[in-house]
Amino acid sequence: PLGIYKRAKAVYSKIEKSLLSEHKGKIIAVEPISGDYIIGSDEVEVAIEGKRRHPGRKFGLFRIGTSVVHKLRRDW
């Protein structure tokens, strides 16, 4: 799994700057073997499309223009 993340991150790093102006804040799912990627408004949207395009494959998920997909908070 870490190898999948590293390969997906390498693909994402190559295309991130070209996506920033139009897609900042959106979610991107990167399939590391093919280099294919899906951009959407949330994880569910990109997961459904990713499963349709590449059944059985794993993806790296990133939020375009940020270093994290989610920020966990403790409100209690």
Description of each model-found segment:
Residues P1-A8:
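Short, compositionally biased leader-like segments
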Residues A8-A10, E16-S18, F59, K71-W76:
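Anionic, Ser/Thr-rich low-complexity intrinsically disordered regions
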Residues Y12-P32:
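Short aromatic-glycine-(Arg/Gly/Cys) micro-motifs in beta-strand/loop hairpins
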Residues P32, E43, I64:
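Residues immediately flanking
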Residues G35-G40:
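A short, exposed loop/beta-hairpin motif centered on an aromatic-Gly-Thr core
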Residues D42-R57:
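A short, charged, amphipathic alpha-helix used as a generic interaction element across diverse proteins
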Residues P55-K71:
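C-terminal structural segments of small proteins and small subunits
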